[in-house]
Amino acid sequence: MILTLTLNPSVDISYPLDQFNLDTVNRVSQTSKTAGGKGLNVTRVLSEFGEDVIASGFLGGALGQYIEEQIETTRIKQAFFKIKGETRNCIAILHEGQQTEILEKGPTIELKESEEFKSHLLKLFKETDVAVMSGSLPKGLNTDYYTDIVRLAKEQGILTILDSSGQSLEEVLISNEKPTVIKPNIDELSQLLNYKVTNDIKELKAAVSQPIFNDIEWIIVSLGSEGAFAKHNQKFYKVNIPNIKVVNPVGSGDSTVAGIASGLIHQQTDEELLKKANAFGMLNAMEQQTGHINTDKFDEIFKQIEVIEV
C-alpha cells in the first residue's frame, strides 16, 4: 500500500474574474472549491491509476470535515488525525491571465498532537510499502519533523519519497535519515546548493553528486518542458519528453511523485519508473483539473518518452 501524508492541507477556492477591481465589490459567476494539498493531488492520481493508496495528515474544524467529505465522494481511503486547530483556506483569484493568492496561515499543531500523530503513523506503517511526504509543515511542528517520519518509516522497511522544499527538506538532507527519493526542480536544487544550476548535463551530474545528497537512492530533478534528469545510485539519466498542449501545469509535480510511488511499489526498472513518473506529470498538465490524469492516454504518452543513460 502507498501512504500519502499531507500535513498542511487546505480547502482550495478559486474565483475566476474577467477583471479584478480593488477597493470595490467583485462578483463571481462560478467558484471552484476542492480539498487541496500536494499530498492529496498525489493521492487522487494514484487512485485514478488503480493503486492501493490511503491519505493521512492533520485535519481540524469545519474545513477539515469538508476535506474528509470531499475525499469520501471519491471513495479514496483516508486516515486523517484530528487536531484542535482549524484547517486553512487557500484562495486564488484568477484575473486577466494572472493569479493572486491569499493563503491563510493554518493551524498550530500542539506538541501532544505532533507526538500522537507519530503513534498514529506507526499503526498505518504496518500495511505501508511506500510513504509519500508532500508539502510544507504546519506551524507548531519542528523543522526536523519530516526527519522523524523518515526514520520511523525506514525502521519499518518502508520506502520514502519526500517532496518538500526549504528548511524542512534541508533538515532531512543534513541528517542521517535519508529518504529513498527526493524530487527537486532546478530552482530548488540551486537553492539547496547555494549556486545557480543550469540544465547542462555535466553541471547536473556534479550538482546531484554533492555530499549533501549522499545515501539518497533516487534524485529526480524536474526540468520543465525539457523533461528531467535523474540519479539512481551511481547511474545518471536524461529524460526527454514530447511536446504537448499544456492546459494547466499546476499539480504536475505532484502527479510526477505519484508516478514515482507507483514505480517503486511495482519494483519497475529505472527506465519504466522514469517514463511513468514523467507521463503522469504530463497527463496532469493536459487537463484543466489539478491532480487529475486521463489514464486512457497513458500508453500513448508513455511510449513517446525517452530515457537515456548519460
From Swiss-Prot:
Listed Pfam families:
PfkB (PF00294)
Pathway listed for it is: Carbohydrate metabolism; D-tagatose 6-phosphate degradation; D-glyceraldehyde 3-phosphate and glycerone phosphate from D-tagatose 6-phosphate: step 1/2
Entries under Gene3D superfamilies matching the protein: 3.40.1190.20
Question: Keywords on this record?
Answer: ATP-binding, Kinase, Lactose metabolism, Nucleotide-binding, Transferase
From the broadest rank down, the organism's phylogenetic lineage runs: Bacteria, Bacillati, Bacillota, Bacilli, Bacillales
Reaction(s) catalysed by this chain, per the record, are:
D-tagatofuranose 6-phosphate + ATP = D-tagatofuranose 1,6-bisphosphate + ADP + H(+)
Name of the protein in its database record: Tagatose-6-phosphate kinase
Class of this enzyme: transferase
Q: Which HAMAP family does this one have?
A: LacC
